[in-house]
Curated annotation (Swiss-Prot):
UniProt catalytic activity: uridine(55) in tRNA = pseudouridine(55) in tRNA
Gene3D superfamilies documented for this protein: Pseudouridine synthase
NCBIfam families hit by this protein: TruB
Gene Ontology molecular function terms on file: pseudouridine synthase activity; RNA binding; tRNA pseudouridine(55) synthase activity
Database matches in InterPro entries: PsdUridine_synth_cat_dom_sf, PsdUridine_synth_N, tRNA_psdUridine_synth_TruB, TruB_C
Gene encoding the protein: truB
EC number: 5.4.99.25
Enzyme class: isomerase
Species whose genome carries this gene: Bacillus cereus (strain ATCC 14579 / DSM 31 / CCUG 7414 / JCM 2152 / NBRC 15305 / NCIMB 9373 / NCTC 2599 / NRRL B-3711)
Similarity comment: Belongs to the pseudouridine synthase TruB family. Type 1 subfamily.
The protein's name: tRNA pseudouridine synthase B
GO annotation, biological process: mRNA pseudouridine synthesis; tRNA modification; tRNA pseudouridine synthesis
Keyword Flavoprotein found: no
Amino acid sequence: MEGVVLLHKPKGMTSHDCVFKLRKILREKRIGHTGTLDPDVTGVLPICVGRATKIAQFLTSETKTYEGEVTLGFSTTTEDASGEVVETKNVDRTITRMEVEKVLAELTGTIEQMPPMFSAVKVNGKKLYEYARAGQEVERPVRTITIHEFVLLDDREVFEGENISFRFRVTCSKGTYVRTLAVMIGEKLGFPSHMSHLVRTASGEFLLEDCISFEEIEENVQNGTVESIFISIDEALSKFPKMVVDEKQAEKIKNGMFLKNELEITAPFITVFDKNDRCLAIYEHHPKHPGMLKPMKVLVNNQELKL
């Protein structure tokens, strides 16, 4: 049993919770996720199973897309709906569509963002949420992120009420905290705010419409069709350039054999396949020997090569 499962992560579970539950359903210990989603967030969570756990780092896409909702009128400790209320301020004026779109435009492009205290970012070897739970505030590192697209999905021309909510879609770089974007929107509009809803609709080439639920996975296990839920390792790595080696080279790859870059591939990672179209390893350019490739991740061992 191996491959990538595109899980539609439910609300209320951590990414680790999802891995733990899948281990029980699939009766497989070698399972890992490709990046954390907050408990309140639903949507695309690629999960690697079996030998596919070796490629998890290559499936952590640089670009993610989310659809969410920001609510103005109060902020929370966690910057989302799960936290305790920190500040309240009634929205005492009408906010126009033009105002909101102007703010979203200002937040599009390369910007700086400070991660929230309730996050897994490490400071001095300790995760920020550990400081937050202990009631400690520490200096947080500012990170540079890229917002590729920030679109207002709500079709209203004006927003009125003590608490105002509106929906958005954002495509952003890896490491972006969307709940912090919700706070930044509120700051620019002059009101405390938080992210009241969020779903990840895409992680790189993996889309929400292709994801399956825990219930669907369990149904496939019971029906004996569990293999149908997996994206193969080869398919998951199809975005990378491909080299094919002969049987003799395939035997040596497991021992870390260097390869000549005969195809003059310039991409940072190259997948290496045998003549049976099985991915053996992922290679990268050798830093000291131009024109040579060195193994970054070997996916087969002696036993697997004999299969």
